[in-house]
Structures are given as C-alpha cells and as structure tokens.
C-alpha cells in the first residue's frame, strides 16, 4: 500500500524511491510487525483475562503444566494482526504470492479461532470437531493449490526442487496439487502439535521464516537463482516481506510468551503460522527444504504418529508421552531446558537447510 503511494510521490521528492528497495521494505516490515506485537501484547493479555479466555490444561499431562491453567490464550490474534498489517503496508498489493499466503494465514487463523473459542468459552475440551477442522483446512489448501496450478502449470512454478541435485526438478503436473495440499495442511498441524511449551513453537517458526526470507530473495533474483540452480520465480521476491513480518510478529509475541508465559498463541496462532510456512514453501518450490529447516515440527509430528500407531498395533507406547517434548519433561528435564535445546536444534536445521542450496 505504502509502496504504491511512494511511487506517486517520488516525482515530488526522490527520497521516496527508498520504498522500491526490497531490503528496506523487509527491514521495516519486520520492525512494524514487531512494534505492533509489542504494543498489542499488554492490551491483548488484559482483555483476554477480562474475558476469562484461559488455557485448558489436560489432567493427564505433566504436573508442572497445572500451574498454566487459566493463562490467557488466543494470543495468536495479535500475531496475525501484526503480520497482516505489516504485509499490507510494505508489500506490493498486486503480487499474487502475497495474497496466497494471506488467504491461508487468515483462513487457518479463523479455523483456529473457532477451535479455541469452543475450548475456552464453551468449555469443550475437544474444541472444533476434528473432521470439520480438517475439512475446512483442506478446502483452503486445495483451493489455493488448484489456483496456483492453473496459473503456473508447465512452468517452474510447478516443478519439484530436490536438494543436492542441480538438474533434478521434475514437472509435477496434477501431483502438484496433492503435494501442496499435504504440505500446507501437514505444516499447519505440525506447528499446532509443537505448541505445547512456553515459546517452543514460536521460535522455530521465526527461524524457519527467516530462512525462507533468504530463499525468497534468491528465488526472486534471476542471477542468484541461476547461480544456486533453483527455479527463478518473478513473484517470489515479495515473499521476503511476508517472511520478515512473521519474524517480527513472532519476536514480539515471544516477549510475552517466553517462560513463564503470560499468554499462549492458541490454535488461532499455531494453525495460521504453520499454514503460512507451508504455503511459502510451496510457492518457493522448496517443500524438501521445509522438511529440513522445520525438522523440529517434523519430529514432533512423527512422535505422535509413532505413539498412536504403536499403541494401536502393539498395545505399547514408545514415548512416555507425545508429542516428544512432553517425553523429555516426564524424564525430568526442566521446561526451559527442553525449550532452549529445541531452539538450538531448530537453528542448526535452518542453517543446514540453507547450506543445501549451495551443496549441489
């Protein structure tokens, strides 16, 4: 929005030309989202407390979590607000990739909001019925994936980039829709499962979004895309603005979500952020890179799948509790130790993922 305004004002003052620089807009996008989150935080927490929108804690969970009962939840609203405002201010509104991310972000946020509302207001511990949650998540994911396929079939936009191989980029055809669906829905649920400890989900999200900001910049730059042997996508550059907005909003939220948390993001935040990371990976043709950089989310999800599968097939559990972060809690690890070690692992995985862009 401000970019368009600056383009009209540059003829009166050349200084407005700075708005055309992607790096400048990326920095101010991050700062805008950060300041909005920091400003909204105390007000959001006070309002949630007034409404008695407190966290519901499982009775079969770790005893250390019982003290979290009643902590304000649905703080993801401030994350989404900060991201959307920042992106609308600093990204080119004509860019289709930006709108794809916003559709998934807001759509999944609405689904998460309904789920949280049923839990905290109606006191329904199960929240939104699972089949309806997955139905609406699927509708959004398939809708966006199908639109992208129609717009980009037979172009690099529907190729699959395989790490470590320069020239292995098969054209997916209709399988692109199926892959995009699983990546978007899967990542949304993976971040949701990870969001079980104070700050555990938000920092890996920040790391992955920061990594994708670099990838988006390279993918939208013809010279760097050619140098790294990745598809050049002319709309990809504006995703840098989206990614830095996620980083800024995430850091602002972490200010209040760090141990001991003053507020939780709830499903409204975790589903939305996960869906956003998923669609960004799809748009950049870096689904494999998401698996590497988002390895913490992958392991958390696999731990749940293995736990459920093992119990149904053998009647035995692999972990003391799933997702796996609860396993380490029950082993005696203090919550801050689990959180920080998962952060360190996440940062390492993002760096490894970025390195794969060159190791080909």
From Swiss-Prot:
GO terms for cellular component: membrane; plasma membrane
Reaction equations catalysed: UDP-N-acetyl-alpha-D-muramoyl-L-alanyl-gamma-D-glutamyl-meso-2,6-diaminopimeloyl-D-alanyl-D-alanine + di-trans,octa-cis-undecaprenyl phosphate = di-trans,octa-cis-undecaprenyl diphospho-N-acetyl-alpha-D-muramoyl-L-alanyl-D-glutamyl-meso-2,6-diaminopimeloyl-D-alanyl-D-alanine + UMP
GO biological process, alphabetically ordered: cell division; cell wall macromolecule biosynthetic process; cell wall organization; peptidoglycan biosynthetic process; regulation of cell shape
Pathway(s) served: Cell wall biogenesis; peptidoglycan biosynthesis
Cofactor remark: Replacement of Mg(2+) by Mn(2+) restores only 10% of the activity.
Annotated GO MF terms: metal ion binding; phospho-N-acetylmuramoyl-pentapeptide-transferase activity; UDP-N-acetylmuramoyl-L-alanyl-D-glutamyl-meso-2,6-diaminopimelyl-D-alanyl-D-alanine:undecaprenyl-phosphate transferase activity
Family designation: Belongs to the glycosyltransferase 4 family. MraY subfamily.
UniProt name for this protein: Phospho-N-acetylmuramoyl-pentapeptide-transferase
Keywords tagged on the record: Cell cycle, Cell division, Cell inner membrane, Cell membrane, Cell shape, Cell wall biogenesis/degradation, Magnesium, Membrane, Metal-binding, Peptidoglycan synthesis, Transferase, Transmembrane, Transmembrane helix
Superkingdom to which the source organism belongs: Bacteria
A Pfam family that the UniProt record links to this protein: MraY_sig1
Residue ranges crossing the lipid bilayer per the database entry: 19-45, 77-90, 97-113, 134-156, 174-188, 200-220, 239-251, 271-284, 288-299, 342-357
Entry keyword Magnesium: yes
Oligomeric and partner information: Homodimer.
Subcellular location: Cell inner membrane
All ranges on the Periplasmic side of the membrane: 1-18, 91-96, 157-173, 221-238, 285-287, 358-360
Keyword Transcription (UniProt): no
Stretches assigned to the Cytoplasmic side: 46-76, 114-133, 189-199, 252-270, 300-341
Cofactor(s) in the UniProt record: Mg(2+)
Enzyme class: transferase
Function: Catalyzes the initial step of the lipid cycle reactions in the biosynthesis of the cell wall peptidoglycan: transfers peptidoglycan precursor phospho-MurNAc-pentapeptide from UDP-MurNAc-pentapeptide onto the lipid carrier undecaprenyl phosphate, yielding undecaprenyl-pyrophosphoryl-MurNAc-pentapeptide, known as lipid I.
Membrane topology, as annotated: Multi-pass membrane protein
EC number annotated for this UniProt entry: 2.7.8.13
